[in-house]
């Protein structure tokens, strides 16, 4: 159909489905990284549409840190079972043996060992040559300059100066042995697009995205939701019930909530229309140092 006749969301949908099918046809062993968040839910929905009525021709991979919200784990298992997806879960055994803890070791070391190294271990273990990721260009400046096909060397490192042009939706997937790509089907989507599409398609999401009374404490300018008894309360800190929700989800000690009364998708969409801050403002890992996200991606991060 002529693009001019398609709505904005349907154009984005068609582009993403084209990318997913292109990778499935071009690469021998692709995988979809499933982080359980709203973007992963949209990406999985698009993949199911791309191959309907068949099943996904690739597995889902969750790189588990052991510190996700309990509701995320429940949602992950329920979703994989409901859709009949093959779900691979990998947790860095070395990090587990070391007892890596975001409270003790800090966000930078926790992310490097449990997420970056864990991801590289899983990709090497299964020999994946392409990995779908639900990141978007509007999230963060290093992601804004990354291509849809993001090439990684045999050590899974990203070189922002060594990228290929992508003209007229033509993608060059030629790689040498040991190399791989990260694929971003949602690159051109915005946070607002994601929420509108979730509402339009009635996509199931983790309830943490909707406002509710939750136990939180204030630490370093962040509202931390207390999800289990591993919290290390500092002197003077008090846990209180507040109406909060999450714009992005990760490890609970490193992900800040936002005060909100948005309990439905239309209310979230309305809230996004007047928001002047990035959804990643609550992610502690983005504050580790200047350019921290780009440095992490150069080392093999998502």
UniProtKB/Swiss-Prot annotation:
Catalytic reactions on record: sulfate + ATP + H(+) = adenosine 5'-phosphosulfate + diphosphate
What molecular function does GO assign, one term?
A: ATP binding
The Gene Ontology biological process terms listed for this entry are: hydrogen sulfide biosynthetic process; sulfate assimilation
Keywords in alphabetical order? ATP-binding, Nucleotide-binding, Nucleotidyltransferase, Transferase
Is Nucleotidyltransferase one of the keywords?
A: yes
Disulfide links within the chain = none
The EC code for this enzyme is 2.7.7.4
InterPro entries, alphabetized: PAPS_reduct_dom, Rossmann-like_a/b/a_fold, SO4_adenylTrfase_ssu, Sulfate_adenylyltrnsfr_sub2
Q: In which pathway does it act?
A: Sulfur metabolism; hydrogen sulfide biosynthesis; sulfite from sulfate: step 1/3
Q: Where is the signal peptide?
A: none
Pfam families noted in UniProt = PAPS_reduct
Using the UniProt record, name the top-level EC class of this enzyme in a single word: transferase
Q: At the top level of its lineage, which domain of life is listed?
A: Bacteria
Family assignment from sequence similarity: Belongs to the PAPS reductase family. CysD subfamily.
Q: Which HAMAP family match?
A: Sulf_adenylyltr_sub2 (MF_00064)
Share what the entry says about its subunit structure, partners included. Heterodimer composed of CysD, the smaller subunit, and CysN.
Q: What is the role of this chain?
A: With CysN forms the ATP sulfurylase (ATPS) that catalyzes the adenylation of sulfate producing adenosine 5'-phosphosulfate (APS) and diphosphate, the first enzymatic step in sulfur assimilation pathway. APS synthesis involves the formation of a high-energy phosphoric-sulfuric acid anhydride bond driven by GTP hydrolysis by CysN coupled to ATP hydrolysis by CysD.
Identify this protein by name.
Sulfate adenylyltransferase subunit 2
Q: Which organism is it from?
A: Shigella dysenteriae serotype 1 (strain Sd197)
């Amino acid at each position: 159909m002529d693009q001019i006749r398609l709505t904005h969301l349907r154009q984005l949908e068609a582009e993403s489905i084209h990318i997913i099918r292109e990778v499935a046809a071009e690469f021998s062993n692709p995988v979809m990284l499933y982080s359980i968040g709203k973007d992963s839910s949209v990406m999985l929905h698009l993949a199911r549409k791309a191959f309907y009525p068949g099943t996904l021709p690739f597995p889902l991979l969750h790189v588990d840190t052991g510190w996700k919200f309990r509701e995320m784990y429940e949602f992950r298992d329920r979703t994989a079972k409901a859709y009949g997806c093959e779900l691979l879960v990998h947790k860095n055994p070395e990090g587990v043996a070391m007892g890596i803890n975001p409270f003790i070791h800090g966000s930078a070391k926790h992310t490097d060992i449990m997420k970056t190294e864990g991801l590289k271990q899983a990709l090497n273990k299964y020999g994946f040559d392409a990995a779908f990721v639900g990141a978007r260009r509007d999230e963060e400046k290093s992601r804004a300059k990354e291509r849809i096909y993001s090439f990684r060397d045999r050590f899974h490192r990203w070189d922002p100066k060594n990228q290929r042009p992508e003209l007229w939706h033509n993608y060059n997937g030629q790689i040498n042995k040991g190399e791989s790509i990260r694929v971003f089907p949602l690159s051109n989507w915005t946070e607002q697009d994601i929420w509108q599409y979730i509402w339009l398609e009635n996509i199931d999401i983790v309830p943490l995205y909707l406002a509710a009374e939750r136990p939180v404490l204030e630490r370093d300018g962040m509202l931390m939701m207390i999800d289990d008894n591993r919290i290390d309360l500092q002197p003077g800190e008090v846990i209180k019930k507040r109406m909060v929700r999450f714009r992005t989800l990760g490890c609970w000690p490193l992900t800040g909530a936002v005060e909100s009364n948005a309990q439905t998708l239309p209310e979230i969409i309305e809230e996004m229309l007047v928001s002047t801050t990035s959804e990643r403002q609550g992610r502690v890992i983005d504050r580790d140092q200047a350019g921290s996200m780009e440095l992490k991606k150069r080392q093999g991060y998502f």
